[in-house]
């Protein structure tokens, strides 16, 4: 006959068995539930991509008024040339861009920030705080592997040695067409071009000198003709496959087909430059530009959509220029959204209205930022597109 102890033990064992059975049953029930959630997420993503593709195919915006691209007000041409002449008529002011940025954005702009990622034993705390493009959290080993392939990590010595450097950041705006600023733009010490903006066929208006080509994989020119032997290719890294793409470009290797599937458009198969001409943009520049200067919200984990907290390549390039050069000028910047049928770029027929469809950038905030830089004399707007 069982005593109290054995009875309690039997009850305990039975309870434990029941609990184990219940827990195992719950786990089994939860697994299909989690699997179902994952399947639903994948289906939503596929449906979303399909929907965006259909909308893109069926979006019939008004055709651009190409007459506006072909006709340029003579007064605007004169004004652009006068703006450029004024830059070179004055004596270059050493440290002007950094000093004025520091005064304008006190505590938000680091005067001693390295423009490019350096090969050092440990990355800075700021570099590792965020995921790309604002930092290299979880990617430090990949960055170090890339840096091991690059023989140089600084601005070229002949440019660093120059007492006072003048930069021009050339945007891709349709406003450049017809201004015939090419010769004047070639006079700057440092010429920064963005993404795939072509020179061939447009040099009369945009010049043919390039010091820096700043872009991300999908934005890099596909044609070898757009690269010159002494260009610096400054890579902006946004996602994991961007590191693999850059590694392939530096090593002059082909990128596997399956990796290409992760890019939203065709990427260059080769970059005809030597490894010493590649640089990696310091992500802290993007972080400071976005969160400190433009006051965008920090990245949040989201299943769908964007926070509009990523600055355009053009804005990032302007901030980079203030770290590289003593004086900074702009050409080809400015979005006139009140003229949706005006050509957006100097090299294609895409309309200004397309900017209303993009979901990554805050055009209004960026325009206000540029207006502030011009008003305070940090930069000079040569083409007059920023109102």
Curated annotation (Swiss-Prot):
Main subcellular localisation: Golgi
Would I find Coiled coil among this entry's keywords? no
SS bond partners = 167-325
Query: Cytoplasmic compartment: which residues?
Result: 1-33
Q: What is catalyzed by this enzyme?
A: a beta-D-Gal-(1->4)-beta-D-Glc-(1<->1)-Cer(d18:1(4E)) + CMP-N-acetyl-beta-neuraminate = a ganglioside GM3 (d18:1(4E)) + CMP + H(+); ganglioside GA2 (d18:1(4E)/18:0) + CMP-N-acetyl-beta-neuraminate = ganglioside GM2 (d18:1(4E)/18:0) + CMP + H(+); a beta-D-Gal-(1<->1')-ceramide + CMP-N-acetyl-beta-neuraminate = N-acetyl-alpha-neuraminosyl-(2->3)-beta-D-galactosyl-(1<->1')-ceramide + CMP + H(+); ganglioside GA1 (d18:1(4E)/18:0) + CMP-N-acetyl-beta-neuraminate = ganglioside GM1 (d18:1(4E)/18:0) + CMP + H(+)
Q: Name one Pfam family in it.
A: Glyco_transf_29
- Coiled-coil regions listed in the entry: none
Q: What is its membrane topology?
A: Single-pass type II membrane protein
Q: Which residues lie on this side of the membrane: Extracellular?
A: 55-387
Which residues are tagged as glycosylated in the record? 58, 208
Q: Keywords on this record?
A: Disulfide bond, Glycoprotein, Glycosyltransferase, Golgi apparatus, Lipid metabolism, Membrane, Signal-anchor, Transferase, Transmembrane, Transmembrane helix
Q: What is its EC number?
A: 2.4.3.9
Question: What Gene Ontology cellular-component terms does the record carry?
Answer: Golgi membrane
Molecular functions per Gene Ontology: lactosylceramide alpha-2,3-sialyltransferase activity
Q: What class of enzyme is it?
A: transferase
Q: Where are the transmembrane segments?
A: 34-54
Is Membrane set as a keyword in this record?
yes
Q: Cite a single GO BP annotation.
A: protein glycosylation
Subcellular location(s) per record: Golgi apparatus membrane
Q: Report the protein's function.
A: Transfers the sialyl group (N-acetyl-alpha-neuraminyl or NeuAc) from CMP-NeuAc to the non-reducing terminal galactose (Gal) of glycosphingolipids forming gangliosides (important molecules involved in the regulation of multiple cellular processes, including cell proliferation and differentiation, apoptosis, embryogenesis, development, and oncogenesis).
Similarity section: Belongs to the glycosyltransferase 29 family.
| PANTHER family named in the record | LACTOSYLCERAMIDE ALPHA-2,3-SIALYLTRANSFERASE (PTHR13713:SF60), SIALYLTRANSFERASE (PTHR13713)
Q: What is this protein called?
A: Lactosylceramide alpha-2,3-sialyltransferase
Gene encoding this polypeptide?
St3gal5
